[in-house]
Amino acid sequence: MKSIKHWKTRVCLIALLLLSFQQLVCAQLPTADLRQIKPFAAAAGKTVELSILGSNLDDASELRFSHPGITAKPVMLPADDIYPEPRRQDSRFEVSVAKDVPPGIYEVRAVSYFGLSTARPFVVAPADSREIDETGNHDSRETAQAVEVNSTVTGSVPARGIDWYRFQARGGQRVLVELIAERVDSRLDGQIVVYDSEGREITRNRDWFGRDPFLELQSEQDQEYFLAISDILYRGGSEHFYRLNISDRPHIDFVFPPAGEPGSRNVYTVYGRNLPGGSLGNAVSLNGQKLESIEVEIQLPEVATPPASFQPWKPRQGILNGHEFQLEHSNTVNIGFATAPVIR
């Protein structure tokens, strides 16, 4: 009898523990999850109105960015017969970017009833950037949307669809075409296929910057190019968004040496395309494309600071100390912090 009583006592204790654990789990607050912002980019010195999408974003009152020069205030609904005072529209904010904010990809989080949300990327474009939204039906080469060199198109790929664009390039012009998707946390695994005016494929690319494609176009004569943008598995939807850059501006491929001692001031060789004052004298090629080079004196800071830009890469890369460097109108590259003198 004693053993039966002991067995019943143990069962009751276990049941009480399970019930108390269930009550603790149920008492946990939901996590604020910011899934999407539209639009997710703005030029320096501009103000845009954006909307936020996600879950558990009740009473969203504030947006916080990883750069102090990017600020936001909620869009207010006007007073009416029912609400005598202006009230906050939870999902819409007016975002202002200061003129001195460097171009890059930054983090944004929402402050809501359930606390600080998860982060999403927000792109700051150069002040003189020509920003274009995809418009109309452009799902075939015949209906391709016309754009100009030195433009950035923001769009999204539909499921089982292709977005087509066309642009005119001058003879000898070195045009760089880049798709930014993974780097802004898009689900798009993109590819770019280039055709000439006769419909012949010239080149294609994917997986240059992680999963994001990048390619170079150069012709001796004036040429019209057609770009076909799609997911490699033809997936699509609102979460398969992208930024398409078509540019003849400077682009840095890499810097040598790739690291320097903190606080040092040394001469580095910058390799890339369309570099100001660049030459092909070093005869360096990357995937069959000749790279220009210039010598630049760079001052590294004494103390490493966390990168201001959004980091979509592997977690271990986020702890690498370094300094973000860029030329005027170029992309940003990281120069690492060396723990010993660098010998060239």
Enumerate the predicted regions with their spans:
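N-terminal secretory signal peptides that target proteins for export/translocation
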Residues: 1-7
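Bacterial N-terminal signal peptides
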Residues: 11-23
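Acidic, Ser/Thr/Pro-rich low-complexity intrinsically disordered segments
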Residues: 28-81, 90, 103, 113, ...
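Periplasmic N-terminal soluble interaction domains immediately after the signal peptide in Gram-negative
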Residues: 86-114, 122, 229
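Surface-exposed, short loops/turns at beta-strand junctions within beta-sandwich domains
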Residues: 99-102, 220-221, 314-319
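Extracellular and select intracellular beta-sandwich modules with Ser/Thr-enriched
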Residues: 104, 116-120, 238-240, 328-333
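Contiguous beta-strand segments of beta-sheet-rich domains
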Residues: 105-111, 308, 320-326
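Predominantly extracellular/luminal regions of secreted and cell-surface proteins
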Residues: 120-149, 328-344
